[in-house]
Regions:
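A transmembrane-helix-recognition feature enriched in membrane-embedded lipid enzymes
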Residues: 1-38, 337
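C-terminal accessory "lid"/substrate-recognition subdomains
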Residues: 2, 160-291
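Residue-level signal for inorganic ion chemistry
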Residues: 14, 54, 103, 138, ...
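Walker A (P-loop) phosphate-binding motif
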Residues: 23-89, 191-192
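Hydrophobic residues at beta-strand termini and immediately following loops
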Residues: 43, 113, 155, 217, ...
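Conserved beta-strand elements of the Class I
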Residues: 71-73, 153, 240-244
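Phosphate/Mg2+-binding loops and adjacent switch elements
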Residues: 77-208
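Short, flexible loop segments at boundaries between secondary-structure elements
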Residues: 220, 270-274, 309-337
Length: 339
């Protein structure tokens, strides 16, 4: 392992240098980000994935969609389409991407769109939906051509960006100091047993600026499953099942299900995995005498491919703050920008 890290170190330095030059060009206004009058709330991260950005977007939609006319703009990673695409009733995970399709399915009253070029995406949204009061920008941390009014950076408790390194030696898309652009740092996936001392240790390692806020939150799993039917989670304890995941970090989910003493076989695939008919056929073969449980994100990709004879469920998740005061402070900080 030390040899591998040694060999990757020069490549990481070169990659980091390129990102530093890029950020410097924006910092010196040689390249100028576009700022819109309509409030833009950005959510992003420094790491390559698995920090809970989508859960944060979902949380914000749930919290504010009844008070404001919201839209969501994402890149639509892994989609088969190109350019600006507006989410519609006949959209799929293939045409929109996993996360945008999930937002569209869960929040049909919200405008959802995808575009590689976010500036053009925002322009399209505002031209087509002139009454839009705010736009949530998904995965926008490194998309410097657009300037959010407020930027939320997500990083996990067990692997904060302060303990990581740039690609390919580590998982960071840019150097740690890029976090200075964020207004809010959300420490996601905080363990329930984390003590105040543990949280203070994380805070100190981040070396926050005076204008930055930090909040700790966890992933809360629903007490029910959905999909083939809506039923209590405890009902699946009666037999062994197949767990299928295609996300960046399935470890917390696996740990949670094992903690409930559920008996299952885990079929793990890479993040945003494009399930083929052959792969789905093998999954169905394993699930002949049982059912399949998956994540809400993977459900959108699997559902069109899975035979209706096979029971396919997903376990919803949501963002949960460690205390009500922190949650209220976070919501007020967001709402101040939406007003």
């Amino acid at each position: 392992m030390k040899l591998v890290r040694f060999l990757l170190f020069p490549i990481a330095l070169l990659y980091g240098l390129v990102m530093s030059i890029r950020n410097l060009l924006f910092h010196c206004r040689i390249w100028t980000p576009r700022r819109f009058q309509t409030p833009l709330i950005g959510v992003g991260n420094l790491a390559t994935g698995g920090t809970g950005k989508s859960v944060v977007i979902d949380y914000l939609l749930t919290a504010f969609k009844k008070k404001f006319r919201l839209a969501v703009l994402s890149r639509g990673y892994g989609r088969s389409s190109k350019g600006f695409v507006l989410g519609k009733a006949d959209s799929t995970a293939s045409t929109l991407g996993d996360e945008p399709f999930q937002f569209l399915r869960k929040h049909p009253e919200v405008t959802v769109a995808v575009a590689e070029k976010r500036v053009e995406g925002v322009e399209h949204l505002l031209n087509q939906f002139s009454k839009t009061e705010a736009i949530l920008l998904d995965d926008v941390m490194q998309h410097r051509w657009i300037q959010p009014h407020l930027l939320v950076l997500t990083t996990t408790f067990n692997q904060p960006y302060s303990q990581d390194f740039v690609l390919p030696m580590g998982n960071l898309r840019e150097w740690r100091k890029g976090a200075r652009r964020a207004d809010i740092i959300l420490i996601t996936k905080t363990p329930p047993k984390a003590t105040p001392a543990d949280r203070d240790r994380i805070k100190q390692s981040l070396k926050l600026a005076s204008n930055q806020s930090v909040y700790f939150c966890a992933t809360a799993y629903a007490k029910f499953i959905d999909g083939a039917a809506h039923k209590p989670l405890v009902d699946i304890a009666i037999k062994k099942f197949i767990l299928v995941t295609g996300i960046a970090d399935a470890a917390p989910l696996v740990s949670y299900l094992k903690g409930l003493n559920f008996d299952f076989e885990h079929l793990e695939y890479p993040d945003h995995y494009a399930f083929s008919k052959a792969t789905v056929g093998r999954i169905e073969h394993k699930a002949q005498n049982t059912f399949i449980l998956t994540t809400e994100k993977d459900f959108g990709r699997l559902q069109p491919l899975i035979s209706k004879k096979v029971l396919l469920y997903y376990l919803p998740i949501q963002l949960k703050f460690l205390n009500a005061q922190e949650e209220q402070a976070f919501l007020l900080q967001i709402e101040d920008q939406l007003q």
